[in-house]
């Protein structure tokens, strides 16, 4: 009996063990996966940040900062934060030294503000592997002349997304359409009763601030001040004495936008009774500009592709239309902004007519200058031919004026002075690069 009870107990334990065996793991069905996906909260992708290195001394880059702020509010996938090398610096020279030291040490931001770099510095950064060659930029949609100084050895190393026009200009009735008349035409007396506001060395200084970059080749590290064109300019400047400005003088004034251009045309008309037109820097046309938004990508950044994408986004028409305090480079955006100025002109014109009790639709009283389609086309032609970056390199300007002074005072011939300019400028470019 005892043996029977023991056997029954063992049988019961065996059956219990069989019931407790682990069931095989079942793979989730597609329906189960969908259910889980709908019930679990989506993972949040952290916002990624790109750093933009710049030198902003005394808050001179407020327009650029405003553009970066607009970009950050545009819904772009990458936010841009500013690294100001001037923070804590006692002078601009200290800030430049700090930036150069950091870049050469490999401590680079994703993006670099290139608008302050001289042509020699820019070429040096490109040739020494600090700036990345840019591919896939929408060149066909942009003003081609603006990008010309951005190339080094045939490769694009930065983009200009916004700029200020930096023209020489004078009376339309004497100059014709913009860029029809050149600086040399005025200097040689081909335009009667029109002269420059400056004379002698001052005139040469103004000309070189606008046009000196045309005579510098950073690819070959050479200069061409001994060219016939520059020798003609140099000789003509020496013959122009400083005198009281004539009523029809050539003037200079940077213009940041179509709105500012229209405002200046109105002021010019109120003072002279006519419009102004832009003078070409040489017989081939062209005028000067100042970059406001000019950015490159640093080779040493781990986020190069994201930085390049940010630059492409800045060239898109939708972002370019948000630029208010500079000229955009996107042609479609430029045309649309000019059309807004045409409409604004019409609205102001109608207001003036109502206030003065007149009914003539075509008159604008003291508003005078009519910014219409023809005026917009003339301005667009100037912008299409803006291809010479203004020269802010004080060392280059000093070289030119030093040697020109020797010519003006009779110690050298024009050609001798130009030869020394070429040698000194080439040496400076080589050392700076």
Name what the model sees in each region.
Residues 14-17:
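C-terminal motif of bacterial Sec signal peptides marking the signal peptidase cleavage site
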Residues 58-79:
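Short, polar/charged alpha-helical segment
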Residues 77-142:
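Extracytoplasmic "Venus flytrap"/periplasmic binding protein-like
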Residues 115-167, 273-281:
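Hinge/lid segment of periplasmic solute-binding proteins
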Residues 135, 148-246, 297-303:
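Helix-loop-helix "hinge/cap" segment bordering the ligand-binding cleft or interdomain interface
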Residues 235-312:
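Extracytoplasmic/periplasmic substrate-binding proteins
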Residues 311-343:
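Periplasmic-binding protein-like
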Residues 348-433:
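Conserved C-terminal helix/tail region of periplasmic/extracytoplasmic solute-binding proteins
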């Amino acid at each position: 009996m005892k043996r029977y009870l023991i056997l029954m107990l063992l049988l019961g334990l065996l059956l219990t063990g069989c019931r407790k065996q682990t069931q095989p793991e079942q793979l989730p069905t597609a329906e189960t996966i969908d259910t889980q996906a709908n019930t679990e909260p989506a993972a949040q992708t952290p916002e990624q940040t790109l750093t933009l290195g710049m030198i902003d001394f005394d808050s001179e880059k407020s327009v650029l900062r405003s553009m970066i702020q607009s970009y950050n509010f545009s819904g772009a996938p990458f936010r841009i934060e500013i690294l100001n090398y001037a923070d804590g610096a006692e002078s601009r020279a200290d800030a430049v030294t700090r930036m150069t030291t950091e870049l050469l040490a490999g401590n680079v931001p994703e993006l670099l503000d290139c608008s302050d770099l001289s042509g020699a510095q820019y070429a040096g950064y490109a040739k020494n592997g600090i700036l990345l060659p840019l591919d896939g930029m929408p060149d066909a949609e942009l003003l081609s002349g603006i990008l010309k100084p951005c190339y080094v050895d045939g490769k694009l190393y930065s983009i200009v997304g916004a700029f200020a026009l930096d023209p020489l200009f004078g009376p339309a009735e004497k100059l014709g359409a913009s860029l029809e008349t050149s600086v040399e035409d005025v200097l040689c007396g081909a335009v009667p009763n029109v002269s420059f506001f400056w004379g002698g060395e001052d005139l040469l200084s103004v000309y070189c601030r606008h046009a000196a970059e045309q005579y510098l080749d950073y690819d070959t590290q050479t200069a061409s001040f001994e060219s016939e064109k520059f020798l003609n300019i140099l000789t003509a400047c020496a013959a122009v004495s400083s005198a009281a400005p004539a009523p029809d003088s050539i003037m200079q004034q940077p213009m940041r936008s179509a709105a500012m251009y229209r405002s200046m045309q109105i002021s010019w008309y109120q003072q002279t009774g006519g419009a102004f037109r832009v003078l070409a820097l040489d017989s081939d046309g062209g005028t000067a500009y100042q970059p406001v938004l000019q950015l490159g990508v640093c080779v040493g950044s781990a986020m190069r592709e994201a930085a390049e994408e940010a630059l492409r986004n800045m060239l898109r028409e939708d972002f370019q239309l948000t630029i208010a305090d500079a000229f955009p480079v996107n042609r479609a955006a430029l045309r649309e902004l000019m059309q807004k100025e045409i409409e604004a002109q019409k609205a102001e014109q109608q207001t003036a007519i109502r206030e003065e009790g007149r009914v003539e639709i075509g008159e604008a009283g003291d508003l005078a200058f009519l910014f219409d389609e023809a005026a917009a086309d003339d301005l667009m032609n100037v912008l299409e031919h803006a291809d010479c970056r203004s020269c802010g390199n004080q060392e280059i300007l000093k070289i030119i004026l030093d040697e020109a002074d020797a010519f003006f005072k009779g110690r050298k011939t024009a050609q001798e002075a130009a030869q020394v300019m070429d040698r000194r400028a080439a040496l400076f470019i080589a050392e700076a690069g």
